[in-house]
Amino acid sequence: MDVDERLHQDENQTHPFSQKKSSSFLIKEKAATKSKDLEHIRLRDLNFNHRKKLDDKKLAKQIPVKANFKKPNEIEARANLNSNELTDINLDYIPDSPSIEKISGPEDSIVVTPRNIIHLQSDSDIILEECEHNYDCSPFYRLFNYENRIEPDDYEAIINAIITDEIAGTYPVFERELEYQELKSLVRKRDYIMYYFLSRDYRGFFQLKEERTLFYRYPSIAYTSPLRYLDNGSETEQFTGDDDEELQSFDFENTSSVRTLDSNIWR
């Protein structure tokens, strides 16, 4: 068989396939032209029928909504209550007293007992009397050169005390030194102007400064300062002889009142 005959035979075999292909293409083209017409346009299904329906059991039950809702009044609410349901109010409620041996915990729990519990002995006496005296006292302080004060007219003892402290390097301290240092840090220029031009000492700093200057200028004042326990006057006043006799007869052990050095207030 020649080559030309084979080519002609192959063309005859492929011709019916091309005819079938062209016929199917024409059918699709006709369908596409029909879909462009307004009469054949298909709208989207808004009911979602294409979705899978749920079972009736899984659907939630619809609750009807009241059209006219009216809020009940307080009188109507009270009328709906039965008198048998109400009880008396317990005004005398007394809670349980807490105890060291019992610690509150959740319900149905075992009572927890601490290890170290303070128990009173059976033969111990408990004092249940009310204390008449006031046992509150001021902080303890050391009286500097007040226990053995020197008389103002004993010049030899005063000079001896001054020389002894000068050699030992111990000097008397102004009793209101802390107050002086605190006021000194608070004083400003306007306080000096008000004091020197208008004689106004609002903080009391300048009066305290004069007392401190007098204290260090005359050291004998530190060694002859009187006791301040029974002094009801000002701090600059001195004791008299009658006050000394009263001081000697005063019973310090049976008194519960203690006075500070910086004030005349009994505590």
From Swiss-Prot:
It comes from the Eukaryota. Keywords: Cell cycle, Meiosis, Sporulation. One of its GO terms (molecular function) is mitogen-activated protein kinase binding. The keyword Protein transport does not apply. Residues 1-13 have a biased composition (Basic and acidic residues). GO terms for biological process: ascospore formation. The keyword Ribonucleoprotein does not apply. Residues 14-25 have a biased composition (Polar residues). Residues 1-26 are annotated as: Disordered. Indispensable for spore formation. This is Meiosis-specific protein ISC10. It comes from Saccharomyces cerevisiae (strain ATCC 204508 / S288c) (Baker's yeast). The gene is ISC10.
